[in-house]
UniProtKB/Swiss-Prot annotation:
Stated name of the protein: Isopentenyl-diphosphate delta-isomerase
EC number from the UniProt entry: 5.3.3.2
SMART domains in the cross-refs: IMPDH (SM01240)
Subcellular localization: Cytoplasm
Length: 347
């Protein structure tokens, strides 16, 4: 029965996120408040622009991550297959959705070594929630998640707001930081910690860095609001009223990124949450990210075909290249030095 409830919850989440009329939020990721200074004399050949980078010791053609979306339900099998095939073609990284259901049910449902066979040359990131980490069970779950897809790293997602609003959610978060510290010591792969759409503050980032986390994904407000999603799933008007108040809650992605990058400029950061296009991606990279992630924005394409996913990211890549060209940036290292200004008042 527990597995059935988890599977139904995953299916509910997919249905809601795929419908643009549902789970609406007014929160902004904040990138519209930043503006590049246009370079009218770039003095470079567009064809010489390179977006190559290294992430988790693998060479990528662009600093893009297919962010964690779905896992553990039958319908996610073809979604993850399309994403993995596209990641391999494009040479970009891929994170899978939570593997909790797959581990507890012993049913991979596409979250297995098939993904590594489909994407042998790119970083694959396993995924578990912080709620699954406490005690020895947490270490076992983490190892199984990594082994299941032969992952290059494990993502631990932090979602206290969603858990607080979700019927039956985990509201006891004591010991989660200690569990993360233990995983850093015990796991044979790097640990990536991310939020799921409410952002990571400078204070929490400091705690994670002190714990030994390798990468932080700020996953800020401005994209999918899981509070709004849980509001849509609510069984009672009272639950809905509580959840909907938090639809716009969180630290905007750009703000979280700048705060952490200023304090720890050498810390590898992923920017996700409301990245709508290649210009947002360029701004995120300039503001301190080493990688940029998208999830919901590509979910519709992933449900159709590998080619649709490739087409989607090729648009993002071309937009990013144009942004480089018009800031006089031949490479990502040049882009990180491009002139950018904070515009307080936006239309």
């Amino acid at each position: 029965m527990k597995d059935e409830r988890l599977v139904q919850r995953k299916n509910d989440h997919l249905d809601i996120v795929l419908d643009p009329r549902r789970a609406v939020t007014q929160a902004s990721a904040g990138f519209e408040r930043w503006r590049f200074t246009h370079c009218a004399l770039p003095e470079l050949n567009f064809s010489d622009i390179t977006l190559e980078t290294t992430f988790l010791n693998r060479q990528l053609q662009a600093p893009l991550l297919i962010s964690s979306m779905t896992g553990g339900v039958e319908r996610s099998r073809h979604i993850n297959r399309h994403l993995a095939e596209a990641a391999q073609v494009l040479k970009i990284a891929m994170g899978v959705g939570s593997q909790r259901v797959a581990i507890e049910s012993d049913a991979g449902l596409g979250l297995d070594k098939t993904l590594r066979q489909l994407a042998p040359d790119v970083p694959l990131l396993a995924n578990l929630g912080a709620a699954q980490l406490t005690g020895r069970k947490g270490i076992d779950y983490a190892r199984r998640a990594v082994e299941m897809i032969e992952a290059d790293a494990l993502i631990v997602h932090l979602n206290p707001l969603q858990e607080a609003l979700q019927p039956g959610g985990d509201r006891d978060w004591r010991g989660r930081l200690a569990a993360i510290e233990t995983l850093v010591r015990e796991l044979p792969v790097p640990l990536v910690v991310k939020e799921v759409g409410a952002g990571i503050s400078r204070t929490v980032a400091g705690q994670l860095i002190d714990a030994g986390v390798t990468v932080i994904d700020v996953a800020g407000a401005g994209g999918t609001s899981w509070a709004a999603v849980e509001g849509e799933r609510a069984a009672t008007e009272q639950q809905r009223s509580v959840a909907n108040v938090f639809a716009d809650w969180g630290i905007p992605t750009a703000e979280a990124l700048v705060d952490i990058a200023e304090a720890w400029p050498q810390m590898p950061l992923i920017a996700s949450g409301g990245i709508k296009n290649g210009v947002d991606a360029a701004k995120a990279l300039r503001l301190g990210a080493c990688m940029v992630g998208q999830a919901a924005a590509v979910l519709g394409s992933a449900g159709v075909s590998t080619e649709k996913v490739i087409d989607h990211f090729n648009v993002i890549i071309e937009q990013l290249r144009v942004a480089c060209f018009c800031t006089g940036s031949r490479s990502l290292s040049d882009l990180k030095q491009a002139d950018i200004r904070y515009v307080r008042d936006t239309p």
